[in-house]
Design a protein with these regions (language model features):
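Structural detector of well-ordered beta-strand residues that form the stable sheet scaffold
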Residues: 27, 68, 98, 151-153, ...
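Short, solvent-exposed amphipathic alpha-helices that sit
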Residues: 50-54, 77-95, 109, 113, ...
Length: 224
């Protein structure tokens, strides 16, 4: 009767075209699609603000920084996160993006690409990662190469990264999403669609930056 989809590629969604032709309602969760006509509603974090929050926190901590970006450029939500970060620092030349790499948001991809970046650059101060798994990969690379003066940011608020915020001086923070809220909103809005009620085209869920300053107010073992 209805489909929930979490796109990992915003453009390659031929199966949704078939579902749309069949009149099946579709809600996208956590990431949108290029062709908005294929879906009834998208429920996602304020991904742009996630990047903004990470950049603002970095600027409070550091007067200048050489920055690396870990990206996933085929996913709209990941692009928005990195763009929010980049836009926040663009008028401050003391914050320089010295390198970037695609890692598909995966720990296993992020670790080797981060190792390659560290081999190219003797000075890296900050890593802005599109999500927490890539932040964990970056952290593994940094630790393996004994580069202990680099701060890492992620986006998600996963239990793994929240635990490391408490334990590791290298983990600066994560802009936390709320999958629990996603699920509630998805179910509520699909029910409305099936009952022929109008729903918003876009529902943005606020994000919260988790750092050492506020980590004790969050459930480290679970999601928000």
């Amino acid at each position: 009767d209805g489909i929930f989809v979490n796109p990992i590629d915003s453009s390659k969604l031929t199966s949704l075209e078939s579902a749309r032709e069949a009149g099946i309602p579709i809600i996208a969760i956590d990431a949108s699609v290029e062709n908005k006509d294929l879906i009834d509603c998208v429920i996602e974090s304020d991904n742009y603000d996630a990047g903004v929050l990470c950049a603002q926190d970095m600027m409070k901590r550091m007067q200048s920084a050489d920055i690396v970006l870990l990206k996933h450029s085929t996913v709209e939500s990941a692009v928005s996160r990195i763009q929010g970060f980049v836009d926040t620092i663009k008028n401050y030349p003391q914050y320089k993006i010295i390198d970037s790499a695609e890692c598909e948001g995966q720990l296993e991809r992020a670790m080797p690409v981060m190792q390659n970046i560290l081999e190219r650059h003797s000075k890296v101060d900050v890593v802005m990662s599109l999500n927490d798994p890539s932040a964990l990969g970056a952290l593994a690379a940094i630790e393996s190469m004994k580069r202990t003066n680099i701060l890492v940011y992620g986006v998600d608020g996963t239990p793994d990264l929240k635990s490391l915020i408490k334990q590791s001086p290298l983990v600066a923070g994560t802009a936390a999403q709320s999958p629990i809220q996603f699920g509630r909103l998805a179910a509520k809005n699909m029910y409305s669609i099936l009952n022929r009620k109008d729903v918003p085209e876009i529902i943005e869920v606020p994000v919260t930056l988790i750092t050492k300053d506020n980590i004790d107010t969050f459930n480290v073992r679970g999601w928000q």
